[in-house]
Amino acid sequence: TSSNNVNESYSEKDPYIKNPINSNSQYYEFQGYLVYQLKDAITSVTDLDDPDKARLVFRCDIKDDVSGIVNQYLDPILGVYTPVEEVSSVISSGMKGSVDNGVEYSFNITEDKFALGATRLVNHKTYYFMALAYGYNKTEENPFPYFTDDPNYDGRNQPFIAGRRNIQVYSAIPHFIEQEYGGT
């Protein structure tokens, strides 16, 4: 198979965890899905943070009291950690899905997030989407990222990890279905 998340069983050892608190804490585990509407078919996973090219339309995650995930990235020039909210703890207005309610496998998209004016989907127009699985490792959460000499410090301050395999652009074309399934 081309996925490392078969049956949502993704687990990857975090090479940066040296002193795990327990035997499971050195692993990233599957946490949820993020689904983006893309501007066009050539938008790639590297463009997901660019609102001119990708917009988050759906999010769900496992039920486990993890609602939002923030990674800390070290700025090599300034020498400071910058927090980046990778997964929001709330559902934004107009977005579908849930926070910490369990994984959902079916949802409706009714709005074009790139539309200027009326946002309702247009029949027979092609829309593009990308689904991204992501993982989480609680041990990567260090409340004091600068105290690297602390014996409890471990990891890189990056509890969020994005899926890297089997990422594809999917197209969808809305249309009336009355004529299908024996309709008249």
Where are these regions (language model features)?
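Extracellular/surface-associated beta-sandwich interaction domains
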Residues: 1-184
